[in-house]
Amino acid sequence: MFQLPVNNLGSLRKARKTVKKILSDIGLEYCKEHIEDFKQFEPNDFYLKNTTWEDVGLWDPSLTKNQDYRTKPFCCSACPFSSKFFSAYKSHFRNVHSEDFENRILLNCPYCTFNADKKTLETHIKIFHAPNSSAPSSSLSTFKDKNKNDGLKPKQADNVEQAVYYCKKCTYRDPLYEIVRKHIYREHFQHVAAPYIAKAGEKSLNGAVSLGTNAREECNIHCKRCLFMPKSYEALVQHVIEDHERIGYQVTAMIGHTNVVVPRAKPLMLIAPKPQEKKSMGLPPRISSLASGNVRSLPSQQMVNRLSIPKPNLNSTGVNMMSNVHLQQNNYGVKSVGQSYGVGQSVRLGLGGNAPVSIPQQSQSVKQLLPSGNGRSYGLGAEQRPPAAARYSLQTANTSSLPPGQVKSPSVSQSQASRVLGQSSSKPPPAATGPPPSNHCATQKWKICTICNELFPENVYSVHFEKEHKAEKVPAVANYIMKIHNFTSKCLYCNRYLPTDTLLNHMLIHGLSCPYCRSTFNDVEKMAAHMRMVHIDEEMGPKTDSTLSFDLTLQQGSHTNIHLLVTTYNLRDAPAESVAYHAQNNAPVPPKPQPKVQEKADVPVKSSPQAAVPYKKDVGKTLCPLCFSILKGPISDALAHHLRERHQVIQTVHPVEKKLTYKCIHCLGVYTSNMTASTITLHLVHCRGVGKTQNGQDKTNAPSRLNQSPGLAPVKRTYEQMEFPLLKKRKLEDENDSPGCFEEKPEEPVVLALDPKGHEDDSYEARKSFLTKYFNKQPYPTRREIEKLAASLWLWKSDIASHFSNKRKKCVRDCEKYKPGVLLGFNMKELNKVKHEMDFDAEWLFENHDEKASRVNASKTVDKKLNLGKEDDSFSDSFEHLEEESNGSGGPFDPVFEVEPKIPSDNAEEPVPKVIPEGALESEKLDQKEEEDGSKYETIHLTEERAKLMHDASDSEVDQDDVVEWKDGASPSESGPGSRQVSDFEDNTCEMKPGTWSDESSQSEDARSSKPAAKKKATVQDDTEQLKWKNSSYGKVEGFWSKDQSQWENASENAERLPNPQIEWQNSTIDSEDGEQFDSMTDGVADPMHGSLTGVKLSSQQA
């Protein structure tokens, strides 16, 4: 199947798979809709079961391997290989499928992007690139079309197959391999050779070679590095590529080879021109590198014989100028033009790239002059070429001649060291004549306008673009772009070299800055609108060598054309504090300690021009070229500081490669220009200077050596170039590392929690085990600790940081899962000195961690709780238990502390203080016993669950009283002075812990039984007891706790005589006499009692 050549095959191939799927879905839906219509024609199951693929076709599709769709254009039919490049595909075919290489390999069509095997390509060329002659017509246009196609009319007998080499970048073709290789040297590697080329006796600009008007000046160029003197420019480029850059493989990869079937060229008659037309311009035999473009028609009086060669957006091609401006069809498919035209008639040639060439005709009898063996013309290409310009020597007796005034052709510089435009002054011979000698200077750079395709000198181009096309001039700043030469720039953010055609898109990714207000834009249209609105009256600075210009057409309508002028970073004109200046010079001397306010010191700036980096400190964000982290601050400060601190390198220029690279701050070794961050890490592992400088392995004498040895000056960090906010922020971050002076802090050695010496030779698991031990000592290591551990243990810093992070996460998960208690004990004696009231949270409990004492207390308390309901137990038994408990707890002053069992409750947040003195405990138990006998309150029936819950001696009625008060919403003062005194006593002596309730019924029962007990407590002491408490000292407290039973019995009898104690306590006030006496009593006993408490700690664990 043959079809017309299609462009944009890459885009079509990407969508082809989706289109096929859509079409298959449509076909499937169609089949489903019409399955009923065709059911009558369907054979029965017998035929379906007994039919095989061999009955239908010659092959079984089930045996064919289903190959995935390949989106790359060059696909091997014998294996799954596919490639985007023809050279890789051809190499694969030659190496793997060499048995039938010539017939099966895909070939490129020399006229379009069609690819096919040899036989199919021949048919393709015959059908599409050799059109039949059109029918004769009387009209002039038909006559012109007929004459244009005369040279392309193939005859079957005249077709020949010719092997040609071609340039894959611009489709330049030639049968000779050397010619194509020289073309590539001359046209596509100027940017590589330019830094090496120098001219004798003249200093070049930006590494370019100044071009003279004499052809012999081409031999004056030489290589800067090795002083090689070539015979030609191509020889010098070849020398640079093969000897210095060593990229000769790139040249070989750019040369392709194919066999093309083309019509045989007809012999041409060579006739001398008329005498009045002897002045003509001789063209070289091989001018295929000239780009076709607009050639303006000029009157015949103008004798300036220069050829217009617009380069951008045009194709590399060659045109043979023949008699009557006849472009004869040759072996490479250049179309021809008819011969019969009137004087002054203009013929437009449709060349590649939509660039018509207008050539005026002055005579019908201008004959072609071609010497034998030298005439060669080349086909047109379809690829765009980079904007480059060339000069060519115009020699006599070479190819063809044109009368003067036919073509205006301004000489254009193809490259900075290309061929020189020479003018011959000899008398023209009959066969071919050259123009008269010209004295015009040929060193002027020319640029082509991308809109009108006209050539202009570089100094007037911007004026033309601004006035003729009403272009708007928009200035911008890109300090991160370093202009290497006219075709290549380097991005300091990404540390990569960028060609001109992709430079603008790359700059828009980082953003262009406004030169007036420091705003950053990622869109040219928005930046132009910003300039029109905000800075319409601002004056632009002068254009420098580092300025890049871009001509853009944004949209149709007003302000369509934009002339963008981007000021970039220039290494020569950079100020002293710039990145490259520090890179090429020695590291700065460590600054002297200064006061904190003066840390932002004035940096001395050279008197060199500042135009190259006018706003060096205005870039808001900087991208590290090694780790791609975003840094805030100016380039030269933030980036240099980040490289020194994070990567331990400083920027420099490689002494051999002359490229921007880095050197180690420890051993001052220089890295190669293609290094990465991993290269630095690998070097630091083996660097001998690491342990002697910043990482602080020599902890004892590190500060003294730093002060004495000037060679270690780069180790000390220089903060004088930093902004003050950065200094303040860094100081806050580093406060935990050192409490000393900020400027001396970087020199302080790192003190590790565990010494890693001796573990560097251990296994990986052993070193990880050491890190786990270190984590148990120091779970939050600083950055410098991690760096020192990495250097000592030969581990990556990322591995160490990840290990610590994983351990911390595991600890957090375990805390959430197991809910461990964190004990935060405090001094009860000091706590008692606090005068104001303290409100402990509901989740805090008080525990006694003396296990032996608490175990005894718990067992005895359970016995007492279970015997509460038995009437045969006497009060004396209870008091004996009390004395045994006080003796068993380790001292006469210790109150009873018990651990409450953690039972799930419905209301876990109600605070229940669980610690009271033993005397109050026994009196409350007696009150509870009397309440059970009386009829004031309902009888409380203790179940087994209640018995289990109340096996703590600390479950007192005082606690329950507080719970009832908080639950009912009443203030503590409403319960009367007695309960207030007891609660104050507990607050001053004990900690709290949340109590738990088994259910609501038990809670209400405790509440009902707690009120009368709490209200009877304050009256159990008489006046004698109160006087004892007031005058008691540390030694007298024991007597209070060991009072005889008669005193407690009298107190209980007095309590029984109280009529309706609940009403009395509700009517009483906090300022009663008994309350004051009880306060004084607690003040006397609290200090000695707290001094004897051991093991009382605060737990954050909730029940």
Swiss-Prot record:
Full protein name: Activity-dependent neuroprotector homeobox protein
Record-listed N6-acetyllysine modification sites: 1036, 1043
Taxonomy, superkingdom: Eukaryota
Region: Disordered, residue numbers: 133-154, 360-439, 691-712, 873-1029, 1045-1103
Transmembrane intervals: none
Listed Pro residues bias regions: 427-438
Species per Swiss-Prot/TrEMBL record: Rattus norvegicus
Glycyl lysine isopeptide (Lys-Gly) (interchain with G-Cter in SUMO2) cross-link site: 39, 72, 144, 155, 203, 231, 266, 274, 278-279, 311, 335, 367, 408, 427, 600, 606, 616, 621, 632, 658, 699, 716, 728, 731, 745, 807, 829, 835, 914, 929, 936, 1017, 1036, 1043
Lineage, top ranks: Eukaryota, Metazoa, Chordata, Craniata, Vertebrata
